[in-house]
């Protein structure tokens, strides 16, 4: 095993000129830093060059980390996929979401699904075809799943149940979840009185010095909320400064 003390840059140098067989060996036998660097390098091969590695070795592995890396690779292959390849990968990701018992594999597959919807501008037709198959994701209350769903939902077609899911998770105590959901709400231009009131309530429970506090205020500014004005005034009075996130929102 490679020492855990190696950095991302060490891994980059070590994997820079390796063949696909050597990269596979890194994925199978290294620590996570080297595994993911090797995986990123494998993404620069054509799909038909790494298809057997993905399907017959990584996805067939009893180790969840190998399966997680397999679906990670599939989401961001850098060489353009043809329709047959894209459909095959979509099927693999949906299967992993539905049937793999590992939460880390499921969340990685959801992230990859989002990347494909974004990169290939997949829309209503493709989502309709997989929608029922992935409906279990809305009921899994696990941190990594919620993050993955929040990211990917930015590139899925509009659905009221997705909007409700996101609003529900604005109550999360995890700052990263709040960040992703605010990003998605902004991207989708979702706004409503219920979102506004929920976020105002969150401000009352959030440390004024936290990044989350500033993100919430920036979002409220972006939807032209008048209720946020006292909170901005309070920042100016108590801190004599405006965070970059808020400043950029005010400029728009």
Listing of model-derived features with the role each one plays in the protein:
Residues 13-26, 47-58, 80-97, 119-135, ...:
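Amphipathic alpha-helical scaffolding segments comprising HEAT/armadillo-like alpha-solenoid repeats
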Residues 2-14, 29-46, 65-84, 104-121, ...:
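Structural detector for internal amphipathic alpha-helices that build alpha-solenoid repeat scaffolds
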Residues 23, 58, 74, 93, ...:
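Generic leucine side-chain signal with a strong bias for well-ordered alpha-helical environments
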Residues 25-33, 59-65, 98-102, 135-141, ...:
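Short coil turns that connect the paired helices of HEAT/ARM alpha-solenoid repeats
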């Amino acid at each position: 095993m490679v020492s855990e003390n190696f950095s991302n840059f060490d891994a980059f140098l070590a994997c820079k000129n390796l063949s696909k067989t050597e990269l596979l060996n890194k994925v199978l036998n290294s620590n996570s830093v080297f595994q993911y660097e090797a995986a990123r390098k494998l993404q620069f091969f054509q799909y038909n060059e790494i298809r057997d590695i993905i399907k017959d070795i990584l996805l067939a592995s009893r180790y969840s980390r190998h399966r997680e890396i397999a679906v990670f690779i599939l989401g961001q292959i850098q060489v353009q996929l043809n329709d047959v390849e894209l459909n095959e990968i979509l099927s693999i990701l949906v299967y992993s979401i539905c049937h793999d018992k590992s939460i880390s594999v499921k969340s990685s597959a959801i992230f990859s699904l989002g990347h494909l919807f974004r990169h290939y501008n997949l829309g209503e037709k493709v989502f309709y075809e997989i929608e029922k198959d992935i409906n279990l994701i809305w009921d899994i209350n696990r941190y990594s799943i919620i993050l993955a769903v929040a990211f990917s939902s930015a590139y899925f077609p509009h659905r009221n149940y997705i909007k409700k899911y996101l609003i529900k998770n604005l109550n999360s105590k995890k700052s990263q979840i709040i960040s992703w959901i605010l990003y998605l709400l902004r991207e989708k231009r979702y706004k409503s009185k219920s979102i506004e009131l929920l976020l105002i309530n969150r401000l009352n429970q959030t440390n004024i010095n936290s990044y989350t506090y500033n993100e919430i205020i920036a979002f409220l500014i972006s939807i032209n909320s008048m209720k946020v004005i006292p909170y901005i005034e309070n920042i100016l009075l108590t801190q004599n400064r405006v965070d970059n996130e808020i400043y950029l929102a005010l400029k728009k």
